[in-house]
């Protein structure tokens, strides 16, 4: 992967990306999307219900479509048939664009939830040019590693943070052959990495969200880490933090210790 700390090529897509990507799932306001664009962010992940991002990106893409990497897609409903084609067509209408950059199949919890008909349909959409690249989001690290070895998918959206570091052994070593782009999410472990866990010494600090993102970005296997701020102020804090650059060895060691303490609580989190 060709990259510096804030810029990378997203795996075999060949697409240059700013390494902090934006999700608007927590409705931070349209102005946050516009500010992100101004700050150089170009990877945007959206669900179909992200109306703020939909409206903002419609406006941005009128003049900057080729600068934007739009990742969205179909939901894994598990108990019912999912059509990536129908989902793609809905997203094209929503965003008023002729193609998606990354068509995702979202929320794959186990291998059987990525049936062959879904994968075949996604490949066909890529061949047709309606999606430039295809990928999935999953928390199943072993399955993600398998998919990386097989080389069908262009992008893998995975969990990787200071508390959940298993991707370092289960996924990242398998990227070399086919070079899928890696997008990381849940960097704060649903904010648990920002709160003092039971037993953590009272005189010891607690990480900020920015520290959590910098921990993830320090791994060169990661192309993009997603931030999902709740406000423009949070976004400003997060991007200012990552612009500080790579964490020191001491900061990395601290994040691992804190991550171990959070993981040790054995709470169930996606």
Write out the residue ranges for each language-model feature.
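N-terminal binding-site loop/beta-alpha segment at the start of enzyme catalytic domains
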Residues: 1-68
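Alpha-helix-loop-beta-strand connector modules within alpha/beta enzyme cores
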Residues: 55-73, 120-129
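Glycine/proline-rich, positively charged
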Residues: 76-162, 166-170, 180-183, 218
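Short, acidic/turn-prone active-site loops that include or flank metal/cofactor-
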Residues: 48-52, 74-76, 158-165, 187-188, ...
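Active-site mouth loops of central-metabolism enzymes
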Residues: 17-30, 72-82, 107, 197-206
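Conserved, mostly hydrophobic/aromatic
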Residues: 10, 22, 44, 70, ...
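Structured C-terminal cap/extension of enzyme domains
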Residues: 34-38, 42, 149-155, 169-270
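Short, well-ordered coil/turn segments that N-cap beta-strands
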Residues: 15-20, 40-43, 64-69, 97-101, ...
């Amino acid at each position: 992967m060709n990259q510096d700390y804030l810029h990378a090529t997203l795996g075999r897509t060949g697409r240059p990306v700013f390494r902090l990507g934006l999700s608007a799932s927590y409705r931070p306001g349209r102005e946050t999307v516009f500010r992100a664009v101004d700050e150089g962010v170009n990877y945007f992940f959206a669900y179909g219900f992200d109306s703020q991002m939909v409206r903002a990106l419609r406006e941005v893409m009128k003049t900057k479509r080729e600068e934007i990497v739009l990742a969205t897609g179909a939901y894994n409903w598990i108990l019912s048939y999912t059509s990536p084609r129908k989902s793609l067509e809905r997203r094209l209408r929503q965003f008023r664009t002729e193609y998606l950059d990354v068509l995702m199949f979202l929320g794959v919890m186990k291998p059987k939830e990525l049936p062959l008909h879904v994968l075949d349909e996604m490949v066909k959409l890529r061949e047709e040019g309606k999606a430039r690249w295809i990928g999935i989001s999953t928390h199943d690290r072993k399955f993600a590693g398998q998919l990386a070895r097989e080389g069908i998918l262009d992008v893998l959206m995975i969990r990787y943070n200071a508390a959940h570091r298993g991707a370092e052994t289960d996924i990242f070593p398998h990227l070399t052959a086919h070079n899928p782009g890696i997008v990381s999410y849940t960097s704060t472990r649903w904010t648990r990495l920002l709160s003092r866990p039971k037993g953590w010494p009272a005189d010891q600090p607690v990480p900020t969200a920015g520290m959590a993102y910098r921990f993830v970005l320090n791994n060169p296997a990661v192309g993009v880490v997603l931030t999902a701020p709740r406000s423009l102020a949070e976004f400003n804090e997060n991007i200012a933090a990552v612009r500080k650059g790579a964490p020191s060895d001491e900061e990395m060691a601290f994040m691992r210790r804190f991550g171990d303490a959070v993981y040790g609580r054995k709470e169930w989190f996606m």
